[in-house]
């Protein structure tokens, strides 16, 4: 198994400096990760830094709260793609889901899917804030709206991916969608366990340590 191609090598900290982003890009080139995941302000820089590789540039939309309007999320998506993004990780409207406004949750996801054209869209459900029933419902809505992946977490809330959540999400969407486990993978064994539970992508800042068989520090 080429575990490197499961990994979105991630740096989303608000105080990330250019030299840290450059280090992320260098590691991505060396280890040939699936993508780097960076904030929108770094997309253009990342695209240039990964020229000549097949490492994708992933960025986030409506991040980390998901509480911006659908129009803003659609604009963010279009701008990110213009700047070179290959993949979009959007955050759902958690408050709308909790309020039972499923039509808004679905239309919000659909707005990003439509704005993305042929680019990959991953839907962050922020599983740590949801009941199991809400997790099932929002995964179904993401599937209905035409998204490519469901993703567990932003890494900025109360918890990251769990094996139980990845298993439930995979059972819900079947084989038609990707499942991304974000946060929680600190070692090779962790990453492998998520893959065995049904994850097809792993979001982590610890990609290098994972591939080296080391235990990483940090919380994402």
From Swiss-Prot:
Catalytically driven reaction(s): 2-deoxy-D-ribose 5-phosphate = D-glyceraldehyde 3-phosphate + acetaldehyde
SUPFAM superfamilies: Aldolase
CDD domains per the UniProt record, alphabetical: DeoC
Active site: 89 (proton donor/acceptor), 151 (schiff-base intermediate with acetaldehyde), 180 (proton donor/acceptor)
A single GO BP: carbohydrate catabolic process
UniProt keywords, alphabetically: Cytoplasm, Lyase, Schiff base
Chief location of this protein within or outside the cell: cytoplasm
Signal peptide bounds: none
S-S bridge residues: none
Protein localization: Cytoplasm
UniProt xrefs under SMART domains: DeoC
Stored InterPro entries: Aldolase_TIM, DeoC, DeoC/FbaB/LacD_aldolase, DeoC_typeI
Gene Ontology CC: one annotated term: cytoplasm
Highest taxon of source: Bacteria
Pathway: Carbohydrate degradation; 2-deoxy-D-ribose 1-phosphate degradation; D-glyceraldehyde 3-phosphate and acetaldehyde from 2-deoxy-alpha-D-ribose 1-phosphate: step 2/2
Family: Belongs to the DeoC/FbaB aldolase family. DeoC type 1 subfamily.
Its job: Catalyzes a reversible aldol reaction between acetaldehyde and D-glyceraldehyde 3-phosphate to generate 2-deoxy-D-ribose 5-phosphate.
Protein name: Deoxyribose-phosphate aldolase
Organism encoding this protein: Streptococcus pneumoniae serotype 4 (strain ATCC BAA-334 / TIGR4)
């Amino acid at each position: 198994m080429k575990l490197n191609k499961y990994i979105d090598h991630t740096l989303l900290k608000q105080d990330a400096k250019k030299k840290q982003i450059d280090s992320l890009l260098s590691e991505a080139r060396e280890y040939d990760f699936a993508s780097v995941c960076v904030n929108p302000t770094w997309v253009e820089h990342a695209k240039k830094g990964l020229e000549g590789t097949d490492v994708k540039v992933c960025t986030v939309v409506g991040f980390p709260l998901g509480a911006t309007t659908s129009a803003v999320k659609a604009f963010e998506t279009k701008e990110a793609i213009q700047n070179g993004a290959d993949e979009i990780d959007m955050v759902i409207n958690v408050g709308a889901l909790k309020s039972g406004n499923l039509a808004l949750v679905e239309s919000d996801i659909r707005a990003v899917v439509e704005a993305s054209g042929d680019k990959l869209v991953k839907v962050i459900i922020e599983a740590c804030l949801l009941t199991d029933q809400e997790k099932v419902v929002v995964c179904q809505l993401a599937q209905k709206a035409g998204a490519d992946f469901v993703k567990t977490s932003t890494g900025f809330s109360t918890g990251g991916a769990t094996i139980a959540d990845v298993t439930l999400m995979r059972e819900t969407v079947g084989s038609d969608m990707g499942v991304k486990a974000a946060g929680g993978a600190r070692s090779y064994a962790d990453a492998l366990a998520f893959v065995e539970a049904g994850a097809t992508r792993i979001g982590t800042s610890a990609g290098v340590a994972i591939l080296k068989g080391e235990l990483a520090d940090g919380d994402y």
